[in-house]
Amino acid sequence: MTSQLNELVEFLHSPQPAVRQIAIDNLVGFSAGPTSKVFKNDSYRPIKDIIKMIMDPEHGTRVIIQQGVTILVNLSEDKLVRNIILSDDKKFLKFLVWKIVDLTNPNADIMCILLSNLAKDDGILAVLNIKRNSSGEEVDDGLKLAALNKEVFKSLRAMDCLMDCFVKGYDKKLTKYASFNYLAFFFADISRFKLGRMYFIEEQEYDGVVPISKLLVFTEKYDAKVRREGVASTIKNSLFDSETHERLLKDEKINLLPYILLPIASAKDSEIDEEDMFNLPDELQLLPEDKERDPIPAIICCHLESILLLCTTHAGREYLRDKSVYPLVRELHKNVENEDIGELCYRIVNMLMRGEPGAGAVEEMPSKNAEEEEEEESEEEEDDDEEDEIVEVA
């Protein structure tokens, strides 16, 4: 089998389009698992061949592009593969993002997965500088591209267009071909880098809106796990710079806090007294009877980590106290049996309810078990980068 695969992968370099098509069609199934090493032959030449096939304006059919991108998705766990894909003056990256933005592209969703996998490396930051020419026409920087749909996209910047795809394209409302859900993971990973997260927390010139505010509504889309998970991580990563916290909390145009708290709240949180309830953000007062917490503990943990990051400044702690965050966390701790959630709840309480220097005694949160939890002294949350989870396609 090994010799046959080695021979088959050589056909990707054939000058005959029909031969290349047969080769890639038969190689897709070998791109995941131990057999994927065949694509590393001859200094990764098969990867370069596949990239050329995908970008071929004459022979890059819908099927070839789908198969080629699927192979790259499965191989992108390899850092060297990611480097190859992002090399060549980022030409393939430009091709990829503009194909995602092409609303007639039936392969947009699989391309979103590839883009999210590529965002594990800082080379992805080049996407922040990718722009179409002033007219958004079909030929740009030597690439043959679909004309930009100016009714949908009001900016020539790739990052703005990707954001519009994600926000407007939920549930395939923008195009029947794509939901753009995996852009959430792309946003999460690019926000690990300072330049990336600055994009999300600064007002953008083309629409006068802070991008993070567009994402907040998706923290409660319980039918879209990928969106919720990616958006929760993007919010958390956007809070790594403490000097921005006060603005993000108090700017009413952003309105950050309610969308961090809503996923951890339930209508069954019955022991929040009237005064504390009154101090909660408006969105958390009088929750509907069917309001439930996010069903995924890991996503709840991500929001709790965001709260911890907001606790790293005095102004942040005071704001969270004023907004009755402690009673909400107390109810979460009491009603959800999960070790990771419980630990994070205790850490938040230690930050919020121990009081500032010189303050008097404060309320203790009761333990769920007989053993005393060790008190956490540190007031700083370590920057916890996202796990380098690579999506594979079967």
Curated annotation (Swiss-Prot):
Signal peptide: none annotated. The modification N-acetylthreonine is found at T2. Residues 371-394 have a biased composition (Acidic residues). Keywords: Acetylation. The keyword Acetylation applies. Present with 20800 molecules/cell in log phase SD medium. This is Protein HGH1. The gene is HGH1.
